């Protein structure tokens, strides 16, 4: 066996390093569409997962500095589109992807956008039950906003015609798929609100993929539904399909056919209701007529009882009875009064008042005489006592003193002058005499010496 040249002999480390360099230089950055599995996130914050398809798989890592830029949380089984560099982990000889960016692939991206819009509108309160408008019962005219060529319109019309053929229907044709569909749906809703032709709207389409139904996840459509004054029933896809329009609408129907069922009246049911109401009406009329007949019979009986001849006869009987009772009562009263009169007459005869009256008159005359004598004597005594009092009063009156030549002087303050201490030279005095006042000036004062009282005699000298 011939040995190779030394340069062609590789160690495992050299081999792995060479392969890594070749992969990194030749492949560079690549885009890969795959499904995520075995996703883990240890305490370091890095993401480790496997990317696979139906035939193969490869390990991948996304470091914390890069995965913080990802706007969603990767889930097991989620389809993603990643940009990565391919490398080889030299210690084990495993080759793997170092992911630099990641985004949902296909429906995954749409689902992410759906969830973001759902969270946004929910936070604004657009899904709240208080904003839901009640549907008219029954609907008088229905508007349908959908494709004029779609199966959904065909199903809706068939059910409405079968259930309630007389119900008017207005169709607002729009695209329900593609870039132009959202604005056409918005314009149709606004047009229906301006015309005010319908009292309820069905907005929807048949089934399809998430991308096919995407017009009903458009924010413009959602806000147009919320702003509508006409109640809106959403009918998008199949029962398992859920769109933003379903959350905003006043009522969600699982399918377009179900929407037609919900807002229309069943002709057979209406007939049954009509028959039931007719029976109830007939029963009510029978009951009403029977009640009125009984009332009429009672009134007739009462009228017979209140006939003028009967009333007059009853009143005559009452009058005769009352008259008899009155005569009897009067006779009884008259007899009673006659008996009382007889008894009083007897008592009066036994108690003649004339002698007593004469005695009382004499007693009265005596009392009058005695009263007059007593009054005369009392007046005489009072007059005598009054004269004595007047004489005494006259004797002590200051005016009487003045008439005897005396006078009364007052100092300037109005006090009566009693002694020389009250005045001094130059003071003015007012002096009262019998017939008036005299004003004078003090020229001089002179005090009279007090008389000395004689000493009392002793008992021995008597």
UniProtKB/Swiss-Prot annotation:
Question: Its GO biological process terms?
Answer: DNA catabolic process
Which Pfam families does the entry link to?
A: Exonuc_VII_L, tRNA_anti_2
What's the catalysed reaction?
Answer: Exonucleolytic cleavage in either 5'- to 3'- or 3'- to 5'-direction to yield nucleoside 5'-phosphates
Q: Which GO terms describe its molecular function?
A: exodeoxyribonuclease VII activity; nucleic acid binding
Q: What are its GO cellular component terms?
A: cytoplasm; exodeoxyribonuclease VII complex
Identify the InterPro entries for this entry.
Exonuc_VII_L (IPR003753), Exonuc_VII_lsu_C (IPR020579), OB-fold_nuc-bd_dom (IPR025824)
Protein biosynthesis recorded as keyword = no
Q: Please state what class of enzyme this protein is.
A: hydrolase
Q: Where in the cell is it found?
A: Cytoplasm
Provide this UniProt record's keywords sorted from A to Z.
Answer: Cytoplasm, Exonuclease, Hydrolase, Nuclease
List the coiled-coil residues: none
Main location class: cytoplasm
Query: What EC designation does it have?
Result: 3.1.11.6
> Which NCBIfam families does the UniProt entry name for this protein?
xseA
Subunit description: Heterooligomer composed of large and small subunits.
Identify its protein family: Belongs to the XseA family.
The record describes the protein's role as: Bidirectionally degrades single-stranded DNA into large acid-insoluble oligonucleotides, which are then degraded further into small acid-soluble oligonucleotides.
**The name this protein goes by in its record:** Exodeoxyribonuclease 7 large subunit
């Amino acid at each position: 066996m011939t040995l190779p040249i030394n340069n062609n002999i590789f160690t495992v480390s050299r081999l792995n390093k060479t392969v890594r360099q070749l992969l990194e230089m030749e492949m560079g950055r690549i885009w890969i569409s795959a499904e995520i599995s075995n996703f883990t996130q240890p305490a370091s914050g890095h993401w480790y997962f496997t990317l696979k398809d139906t035939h193969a798989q490869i390990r991948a890592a996304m470091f914390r500095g890069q995965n913080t830029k990802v706007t969603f949380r990767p889930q097991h089984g989620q389809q993603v589109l990643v940009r990565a560099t391919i490398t080889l982990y030299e210690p084990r000889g495993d080759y793997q992807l170092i992911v630099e960016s990641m985004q949902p692939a296909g429906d995954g991206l749409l689902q992410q956008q759906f969830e973001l819009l759902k969270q946004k509108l929910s936070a604004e309160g657009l899904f709240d039950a208080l904003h839901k408008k009640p549907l008219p019962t029954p609907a008088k005219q229905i508007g349908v906003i959908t494709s004029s060529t779609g199966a959904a319109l065909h199903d809706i019309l068939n059910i409405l015609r079968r259930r309630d053929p007389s119900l008017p229907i207005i169709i607002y044709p729009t695209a329900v798929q593609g870039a132009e569909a959202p604005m056409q749906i918005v314009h149709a809703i606004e047009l229906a609100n301006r015309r005010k032709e319908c009292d309820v709207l069905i907005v929807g389409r048949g089934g399809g993929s998430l991308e096919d139904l995407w017009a009903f996840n458009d924010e413009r459509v959602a806000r147009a539904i919320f702003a509508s004054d006409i109640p809106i029933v959403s009918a998008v896809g199949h029962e398992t399909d859920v769109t933003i329009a379903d959350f905003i609408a006043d009522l969600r129907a699982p399918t377009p056919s179900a929407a037609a069922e919900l807002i229309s009246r069943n002709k057979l049911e209406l007939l049954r209701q009509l028959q039931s109401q007719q029976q109830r009406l007939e029963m009510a009329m029978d009951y009403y007529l029977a009640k009125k007949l009984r009332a009429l019979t009672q009134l007739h009986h009462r009228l017979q009882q209140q006939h003028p001849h009967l009333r007059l006869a009853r009143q005559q009987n009452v009058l005769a009875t009352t008259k008899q009772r009155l005569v009897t009562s009067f006779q009884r009263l008259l007899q009673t009064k006659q008996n009382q009169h007889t008894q009083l007459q007897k008592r009066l005869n036994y108690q003649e008042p004339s002698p007593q009256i004469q005695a009382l008159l004499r007693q009265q005359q005596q009392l009058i005489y005695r009263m007059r004598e007593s009054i005369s004597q009392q007046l005489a005594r009072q007059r005598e006592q009054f004269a004595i009092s007047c004489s005494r009063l006259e004797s002590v009156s200051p005016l009487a003193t003045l008439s005897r030549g005396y006078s009364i002087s007052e100092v300037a303050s109005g006090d009566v002058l009693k002694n020389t201490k009250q005045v001094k030279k130059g003071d003015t005095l007012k002096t009262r005499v019998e017939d008036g006042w005299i004003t004078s000036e003090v020229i001089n004062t002179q005090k009279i010496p007090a008389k000395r009282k004689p000493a009392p005699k002793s008992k021995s000298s008597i």
